[in-house]
């Protein structure tokens, strides 16, 4: 049974204009995600950061709490399987979290569906 659906669209250029990207990265990405970001550069790094931010926004909408007191960016971790498919590997929901990420040059859109009993 579907518990919740969340969708988000984010402008990638917004991340290029960050005044303190290190602080923002530490707030949004887990240690494992930060290590993966370190291996990327240029446009691909911005797409990665925007994509992970957007997934976490979508997840918070599907979960029904938004980001804040009950759920923060560090509670959600995105990884990729052997085929490059995004997977939400760490999250508070007891069921399954399905995720889709798509981006163009300037935007990323994500959708999260939470499924449980």
From Swiss-Prot:
One Pfam family named in its UniProt record: ACPS
Compartments in which it is found: Cytoplasm
Q: Which GO terms describe its molecular function?
A: holo-[acyl-carrier-protein] synthase activity; magnesium ion binding
Q: Which GO terms describe its biological process?
A: fatty acid biosynthetic process; lysine biosynthetic process via aminoadipic acid
Q: Which reaction does it catalyse?
A: apo-[ACP] + CoA = holo-[ACP] + adenosine 3',5'-bisphosphate + H(+)
What is the E.C. number?
Answer: 2.7.8.7
Instruction: Enumerate the cofactors the protein uses.
Output: Mg(2+)
UniProt keyword annotations, A-Z: Cytoplasm, Fatty acid biosynthesis, Fatty acid metabolism, Lipid biosynthesis, Lipid metabolism, Magnesium, Metal-binding, Transferase
Q: Which sites bind Mg(2+)? A: 8, 57
Q: Does the keyword Transferase apply?
A: yes
GO CC annotation: cytosol
Enzyme class, first EC level, given as a word: transferase
**SS bond partners:** none
Keyword Transferase assigned to the entry: answer is: yes
| Its biological purpose | Transfers the 4'-phosphopantetheine moiety from coenzyme A to a Ser of acyl-carrier-protein.
Give the NCBIfam families listed for this entry.
Answer: acpS (TIGR00516), pantethn_trn (TIGR00556)
Spell out the HAMAP family in the cross-references: AcpS
Please give the family membership noted in the entry: Belongs to the P-Pant transferase superfamily. AcpS family.
State the name under which the record lists this protein. Holo-[acyl-carrier-protein] synthase
Source organism (scientific name): Limosilactobacillus reuteri (Lactobacillus reuteri)
Q: What is the lineage of its organism?
A: Bacteria, Bacillati, Bacillota, Bacilli, Lactobacillales
* Gene name of the record: acpS
């Amino acid at each position: 049974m579907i518990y919740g659906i969340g969708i988000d669209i984010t402008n990638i250029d917004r991340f290029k204009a960050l005044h303190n990207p290190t602080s923002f990265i530490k707030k949004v990405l887990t240690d494992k995600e930060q290590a993966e970001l370190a291996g990327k550069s240029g446009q691909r790094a911005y797409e990665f950061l925007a994509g992970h931010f957007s997934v976490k926004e979508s997840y918070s909408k599907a979960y029904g709490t938004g980001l804040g007191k009950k759920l923060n960016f560090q509670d959600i971790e995105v990884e990729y399987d052997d085929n490059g498919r995004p997977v939400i590997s760490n999250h508070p929901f007891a069921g399954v979290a399905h995720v889709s990420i798509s981006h163009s040059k300037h935007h990323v859109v994500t959708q999260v569906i939470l499924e449980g009993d």
